[in-house]
Amino acid sequence: MVTMKDLLECGVHFGHQTRRWNPKMKRFIFGVRKNIHIIDLQKTLRYFRYTYNIIKQAASEGKVIMFVGTKRQASETLKQYAESVNAPYVNYRWLGGMLTNFSTIKKSIRRLEIIEEMESSGQIDLLTKKEKLMLQRKKEKLDKYLGGVRHMKKAPDMIFVIDAAKEKIAVAEARRLGIPVVAPLDTNCDPDMVDYPIPGNDDAIRSIQLFCKEISEAILEGRSENKDEQNEQGEQIAPVTNEEKQEILDEVTAEVATQMQEEA
């Protein structure tokens, strides 16, 4: 579990410039140094350990925790730790409705599965060069946006967010559905929007790595206490039908025809 030494070494105590603060964060601020708010690490440590146990308990009950963090310095780290514990994640861009309209997201995930099946069966090689290229581009785009949630069968039970201010749409969707939100809170954040806050720097790479590492370890520790856990993410993909393939082929053919008309 996290220590005071970890927090100091990773710069978790450095907040934003004083002019960028949210007054609601006042209770978590220790002082000011060179116009930078310094976060009270005694409180950070207490909140961190409390939240660690909340995550651990949720994981021990078989609950699914989604990782969300799309900004540049968080994207790869978040993906790495989420994949290490087989957790769903969004690290490129949050699509509106990812939680509140999950049925539509599942349809897009299904399209990705269909295209991949067409690739593995060799059917994609029977298409024209333009059709094949267009289909591959569709696959790349779907994978970029939805690759991290493709095995998620329902909305998550909890979300862990890096930069709650930036990911305000994800946070708002979770709150609308009653899904608890866990997040480090920098001095520019609104603590009222987060169920389980951890006051701390959400911009520095080392700080982000520490948060992701600890949350991942809490998940693993919780799962180890649940020997009977049935992980929904291991479910088999439904067989792709010819009708599903044909629907995508018709769409690609129409798009290629439109493109050729525009080029003519």
UniProtKB/Swiss-Prot annotation:
GO molecular function annotation: structural constituent of ribosome
Cited Pfam families: Ribosomal_S2 (PF00318)
Annotated CDD domains: RPS2
Annotated TM spans: none
A GO cellular component entry from the record: cytosolic small ribosomal subunit
Biological processes per GO annotation: translation
Keyword S-adenosyl-L-methionine set for record: no
Domain of life according to the entry: Bacteria
Chain intervals for the UniProt region annotation (Disordered): 222-246
HAMAP family recorded: Ribosomal_uS2_B (MF_00291_B)
NCBIfam families in UniProt: rpsB_bact
Similarity comment text for this entry: Belongs to the universal ribosomal protein uS2 family.
UniProt protein name: Small ribosomal subunit protein uS2
Source organism per UniProt: Helicobacter hepaticus (strain ATCC 51449 / 3B1)
